């Protein structure tokens, strides 16, 4: 299974993402730049890492979402290719219209960098099939604008159709996200956006491997 990592000016978690994928799959992902208009046909998983694309000017992810490469990402997603955006990558997916809702400034108005606990609220997706329903996993967060919001109708649909796949466990919501939402998928289930950083917990020697199953599930391999 082959993966691709999207590179944009200002992202700073691309090396972490590349290292995680290389360790899990045994091969380095291909890298695709912001001005590229296509993604290799044999790619099974596209990842948009975290950071501060284009300095977070206008809104987080707003400029990145309008780069040529995102049209290529959109075309792949429409064909069923797995797409995953983490932190700024999640913000970009929202700005690109690939996922519903918005990410606002943290309720504390402060940058938050710490470990949180996540509840797996839907283990019946390709991304989360390596977990058990209700399982609590550890994951670090590092963001200033991670407060997820959506209107009542959108929230009802997300909750009712099982599109909320990760929720901050009780008492650990770091940003004020509505319904403690930490990660969602699209209706088809092949596009995931989440604020926490699973790529930073894939080796026991580095503090834990709770994030490993997420990548393995998306690629259809054994964790």
From Swiss-Prot:
Catalytic activity of the protein: N(2)-formyl-N(1)-(5-phospho-beta-D-ribosyl)glycinamide + L-glutamine + ATP + H2O = 2-formamido-N(1)-(5-O-phospho-beta-D-ribosyl)acetamidine + L-glutamate + ADP + phosphate + H(+); L-glutamine + H2O = L-glutamate + NH4(+)
The record, for CDD domains, names: GATase1_FGAR_AT
**Predominant cellular place of this UniProt entry's protein:** cytoplasm
This entry's Enzyme Commission designation comes to: 6.3.5.3, 3.5.1.2
Give the UniProt entry's GO cellular component terms. Answer: cytoplasm
The record's subunit annotation is: Part of the FGAM synthase complex composed of 1 PurL, 1 PurQ and 2 PurS subunits.
The name this protein goes by in its record: Phosphoribosylformylglycinamidine synthase subunit PurQ
According to the entry, what is the taxonomic lineage of the organism?
Bacteria, Pseudomonadati, Pseudomonadota, Alphaproteobacteria, Hyphomicrobiales
